[in-house]
Each structure stands twice: as structure tokens, then as C-alpha cells.
């Protein structure tokens, strides 16, 4: 399976607080059988919130890309197809970062791994069995 981790999941991973995630999420995301991605959109959101003093990601911002790569995550850039993708059904959220993550899932055939209740109801979100 191919997963895109949302910002909240990436923050939990960066802080090394795996106990905050369902064990099935950790197993699926870190399994060599699956491909898991971290979006540039999420890193951008983390950087903005950190610089505004609203978030402590647990690592220096410059260290995040290397850390995510070290734990087996692939990076996903934002491209034009992601930027213009309309979503069906419309997500129940207005946050532009969440919307671009869903657009990336739709374009790249990924499933969104999230702990955000508002996002978890969208058909592009993955629910552990």
C-alpha cells in the first residue's frame, strides 16, 4: 500500500511519541512492504507553525527531512497537478495544507494516514483494519 502521512502524524514521529499512534498505524507506515511519504506541504506547515512559536516539532527544522528519510519515508513535492486537483467528495475542512494533502493522495493514488477526526472520514483517508 502507498501512504501519505499527514502533518499530525509526522509531528508525532519527529517527537518520537509513537505511543500516541495506534500500533497498526506504526506497523503499516514503517513496514518495508508499504511505501510511505512525507509531503513538502507538511514540512512547510511545520516550519510555519514552529517559526510562529506555535509548535515544537522535537527536532531542528533543518533536521526533519533527513530524519524522515532515515526512518524510511519518501519525500513528495507539490506539483501543478496537486495544486489544481478538485476533490470529490469535497473534504469537510478548509485548511489549505490538509486540502493539498488530499489532492496529492488523489493524484498519486495514496491513502492519507491521519489522526485528525475531520480528515479521517474522507474516502482518501486510510483506516487501520
Language model region names:
Residues 6-7, 46, 86, 105:
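Generic structural signal for small/hydrophobic residues in well-ordered secondary structure
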Residues 11-12, 47-49, 84-87:
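A short acidic, helix-capping loop that chelates divalent metal ions and anchors anionic groups
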